[in-house]
Amino acid sequence: MKLMIFTGLVLFAIVSLIEAQAENEKPCLPEYKVRTHAPGNCCSDLVCDCYGRYKSGAQIGRNCFCLQKGVIYKREN
């Protein structure tokens, strides 16, 4: 009986530890993934770049994107 209780407690502790680690590990965001309001955690080969959105001169929001490192993006007309 004691062995069953001990085994149950050990299994409970292991499952709790695994769940806690899974919550702490955030998956990285892939290329061109949009995250609003705050920079996200982009994958290691990417960089987070944020832009403000304006309407009639007032900022209405902010978007952050995961983009390739070292690549320059230009606006096309």
Curated annotation (Swiss-Prot):
Post-translational modification: Contains 4 disulfide bonds.
Positions of the propeptide removed during maturation: 21-26
Molecular function terms from GO: toxin activity
InterPro entries with a match to the protein in the record: Spider_toxin_CSTX_knottin
Signal peptide range in chain numbering: 1-20
Chief subcellular location: secreted
A Pfam family assignment: Toxin_35
Cellular component terms per the entry's GO annotation: extracellular region
Organs and tissues of expression: Expressed by the venom gland.
Location within or outside the cell: Secreted
This protein's UniProt keywords: Disulfide bond, Secreted, Signal, Toxin
Family designation: Belongs to the neurotoxin 19 (CSTX) family. 08 (U8-Lctx) subfamily.
Name under which the protein is recorded: U8-lycotoxin-Ls1l
Organism (species): Lycosa singoriensis (Wolf spider)
